[in-house]
Design a protein with these regions (language model features):
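GIY-YIG nuclease catalytic motif and its immediate N-terminal context
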Residues: 1-37, 42-52, 62-66, 79, ...
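A common structural junction motif
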Residues: 71-73
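Exposed acidic/Ser/Thr-rich ligand/metal-binding surfaces
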Residues: 76
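C2H2-type zinc-finger recognition helix
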Residues: 58
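Short, surface-exposed polybasic/aromatic micro-patch for ligand or macromolecular engagement
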Residues: 55
Length: 100
């Protein structure tokens, strides 16, 4: 059974939040941090993992991502604050190593 994740990336000042979905959270966070893709997170320097949820079904994760993206910022902040009041980078200390 493969795990899937919905996650929030924030910039240094916590003024911008990006919501994404992935089946490999460690790799995806690494891609955001290294700006592998020149998209939203690279443009707005969203390189802190501040929140994530785990799912056993990718379809549930995608549905949750859509639900969260449709919500207002206050609701997103409440989710983050419930588990990460200081908005610390939850990936701090992770070792990033990939064979490609």
């Amino acid at each position: 059974m493969n795990k899937s994740y919905v996650y929030f990336m924030a910039n240094k000042n916590n003024t911008t939040i990006y919501i994404g979905v992935t089946s490999n959270l460690v790799k995806r966070v690494y891609e955001h941090k290294t700006k592998k893709f020149k998209g939203f997170t690279a443009k707005y320097n969203c390189n802190k993992l501040v929140y994530y949820e785990e799912f056993t079904d990718i379809n549930q994760a995608i549905a949750r991502e859509k639900q969260l993206k449709a919500g207002n910022r206050k609701r997103k902040e409440a989710l983050i604050n419930a588990v990460n009041l200081d908005w610390k980078d939850l990936s701090e200390g992770w070792l990033f190593y990939f064979d490609n």
